[in-house]
From Swiss-Prot:
Keywords: Cell inner membrane, Cell membrane, Heme biosynthesis, Membrane, Transferase, Transmembrane, Transmembrane helix. It comes from Legionella pneumophila (strain Lens). One of its GO terms (molecular function) is protoheme IX farnesyltransferase activity. This is Protoheme IX farnesyltransferase. InterPro entries: Protohaem_IX_farnesylTrfase (IPR006369), UbiA_prenyltransferase (IPR000537), UbiA_prenylTrfase_CS (IPR030470), UbiA_sf (IPR044878).
Amino acid sequence: MRTEYADRLPVDWRDYVELCKPRVVLLMLLTVIVGMYLAAPGWVSLRLIAFTLLGIGLCAGSAAAINHLVDRHIDSIMARTKKRPVAYGRVSVKQALWFAVIIGLMGLSLLILFVNQLTALLTFITLIGYAGVYTGYLKRATSQNIVIGGLAGAAPPLLGWTAVTDQLDPQALLLVLIIFTWTPPHFWALAIYRYKEYQDAEIPMLPVTHGIQFTKLNIYLYTVLLLVVSLLPFVVSMSGWIYLLGALILGIRFLVWAHKLYFTDKPVVAMQTFRFSILYLMLLFVFLLVDHYF
């Protein structure tokens, strides 16, 4: 593999940025910010926001770098990922490992020193859950990898909440439940589009193990469940009418995409559904934030 020779090649700083999966981390940090503001009756101090985002962001980048490291052989097979820094050989295994360890320790240190120990602990558990349990084991072990491993990816709003309150709260767990329910239809839509690549890499994603039509049915059912779960903040008086209207519009639109995906054989619809799911989560959390203050 090219990775063997990466120590001899000049490394661009952009390769290290790519290791952190910045677009994924930015979406995650949006949910952290919303969690912080929903936990506070007023405004949150900029100092706390800065240290929380920096600490959690560094830890998320560390987990992403470990994902690149562990999945380098798989990534080299798949067209979508074969040019990732470690898989392509621009960053060596040793370089990626040291980078992940250093920024992970930096992130945890910032959280311990400037936020609180509970947030640092939960962030560490999340890092281990994603980088160790999901990437290292679940991804290759079961077709329910995304469902079980999705809990780690759903934690960011809880981390934002505890950064402000230094305690666990049922309302914060509601935000976790929303992302946890959103994760399967989000990733399974991509898995349908990339079906052949996952099959060639021998990754037991649901479309590979149970077929594409069965996966489409599961996407549809999870999208219905997501619509119901997304209304819970209004039901428990955590949010008001602005959020309810936004959640209904977004949820119904997501259902339309799931319906369209179920009844079509066009692969492009799976990618369109995947892309809408990202927009859905962004806007849903924006509605939560807007509703909180207006």
